[in-house]
Amino acid sequence: MMVTGEAMGCVRCIARCHLRFDEKKKQMDIEAVKEIIRQGDGLSNTLGMEFLSTPEPDIVRARMEVNDRNKQPFGFLSGGASLALAENLAGVGSMALCPGKVCVGISVSGNHVKAMAYGGVVQATAHLQHKGRTLHVWHIDITNEEGDLISTVQVTNYIITPRKNG
């Protein structure tokens, strides 16, 4: 994958993020994740995703309330918002595992098995299935507060090593 021009500036910015798994604390630096979200006007901020602390480097958790920003016209959680939640979890997980690298989603595939009504809260848990040098594969389950499955998603991330020059 070739990254050039304005996109390369974004790649350099992302690569400087200090997002990592803290071996001493046995958790991801969730405050760094939250700060990245607060600084931007990206999709995770727009949809109201809240990242939660986790005890392992290969698991990422988040929650999201179903509201006007992420519902479909009938008042249920949009399938696209569910996929965005899953891809964001996988991206954060890959970034934490690969400090100084850029992680981009190249495949997202999901199945929606139950509706989630307006005002409800979904919880998502991403588990790393494969950690290669250039590819990570994550499995994400999105559930309601009772633990019922709402969506199940697989995300593949491509890991990019930024060029050192310019």
Annotated model-derived regions:
Residues 1-2, 8:
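Methionine residue identity
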Residues 9-166:
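Terminal targeting signals and extreme-terminal segments of soluble enzymes
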